[in-house]
Amino acid sequence: MSTMIQYVLYLAILVVLAIPLGAYIKNVMSGEKTFLSKVLTPCENLIYKVTRVDREEQMTWKKYAVSVMIFSGIGLVFLFLLQLLQGVLPGNPQHLSGVKWDLAFNTSASFITNTNWQAYSGESTLSYLTQALGLTVQNFVSAATGIAVLFALIRGFIKVKSSGLGSFWVDLTRIVVHILLPLNLVISLLLVGGGVIQNLKSAETVSLVEPIAVSAEGEILEDTVIDLDTETVTVDGEIVSNAQIVTEQFVPMGPAASQVAIKQTGTNGGGYMGVNSAHPLENPNAFTNLIEMISILLIPAALCFTFGSAVKNKMQGIAIFMAMFLCLVVALGCIAVTEQVGTSQLAQNGAVNMSMAEQAGGNMEGKETRFGIAASSTWAAFTTAASNGSVNSMHDSYTPLAGMVTMLLMQLGEVIFGGVGCGLYGMLAFAILAVFIAGLMVGRTPEFLGKKIEPYEMKWSVLVCLATPIAILVGSGLAAVVPSVMDSLHNGGAHGFSEMLYAYSSCGGNNGSAFAGFNANTVFLNVSLGLVMLFARFLPIIGTLAIAGSLAGKKKIATTAGTLSTTNGMFVFLLIVVVLLIGALSFFPALALGPLAEFFGSIA
């Protein structure tokens, strides 16, 4: 019962916070005053003055798209060079060398696309300068880019016989100054208060309370007797040769809290530490876990209410929100149940039944005992529903069915809330498809929010919806026939295939999480995954802006008795069916070879 209360509490807090934030974002989008305007508007105006941006400019969809591409391209080149040259730049107290070109390209593509796929361990690969000036900055502007494209699409629904969608530069500035900076300042302070590190100290080495012994293979030896004077390790009275005695531990330092805040709210996901929010210095306790977890879906959920308010049809925003929310609840339920029950092998040895006051049992492999099944399962559902990718547990250790659900959430196109901005404009593309299908069934010209949906919008909507499946399936298909990729798999068989499919699903869905057994730091994988991320990010952006430009040029159609309602339960059901059909039809064969084969093999 207490576990169920946790799930309900997490979801309730999300909804309660999302509604007022959605109203605030709507005011920012339309340039209306907010309670922070007196402080932030002068900063915004100063940026326009310095950069000579015309705040009244109305860009066509093509100019808006070109601006997005140029801005992202500059970010890609800057971050790439910053990584290559970090060895000779300041802000590097650990004297880390420059990053290899293929990993630098992969990381640059990852962060400018809001994916934050990490084929490296942050605390041992990147300097403080690279983390702060490179990654953290991209966390802000890549998130702002996604929201800006959504703003352009919303204006497409609002405007009548117009070619202007607003200015990308104005939208970008407003989003960063009025939304992301104040929100993340508050969250950063909460995280620091909860124990997340935030400093510029060099990494420290501390003495362990008691020494441990490690075998030649790097595994910790148990039940050992360690003699520090003779430097010998014995197990059951026998000396273990080649054993190494460890008496000190490396403790990373750095500006973690500020990066953790934006990695969550911006659905970026890239951790300051290699193990992301499973690290006790990045997510030390239940309080910080709650803050970080709710932050994942806060803006994506709020944008649904922003959309409804902006198009002057709040029920439309609620309908989109309910479609996403219902899918999330079902996915969370599947993950939670399968993780609590575990596998037949765990049940046989009694592991899932070991319930104590501190631990409720279940599949605890790869999970932190300070979080348990409920917080870990909720985070897994939230982070893969959004294009976030941060983790507080290792998804590679989840049961086959739970792993499949996390994979499917990404493969659906990251539209079950999805990334900030991109999740909602992806779902709106599915909504256009749903309206078109419904129009065919009743023999009427499809329309959505008073705008006719014609072949031009349909073609671009299909492209937006299929970009993710194409990127994932083509990428993973090519990787499956490259011999060197097999060396990156920690496991063979169905689970090994799942590791590879998850990697391409994560990058194609701009998510960034991974099955930890997959070694992605090779030239082929760094380049191929980087290209998948770029394709899956910018093709939908171009398609969305093309739809926005077309809709803005149309006139409004009066609602009649024969107009399909897009705010009732029937439309919500139809929208969910369309999303699931495209996902299921596209990925069922691949899922059958991976997690489904592993599941049925485990019960055979």
List PLM regions with ranges.
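Hydrophobic core segments of alpha-helical transmembrane domains in multi-pass membrane transport
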Residues: 9-22, 71-84, 148-155, 185-195, ...
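C-terminal catalytic subdomain
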Residues: 429-433, 438-442, 459-485, 489-490, ...
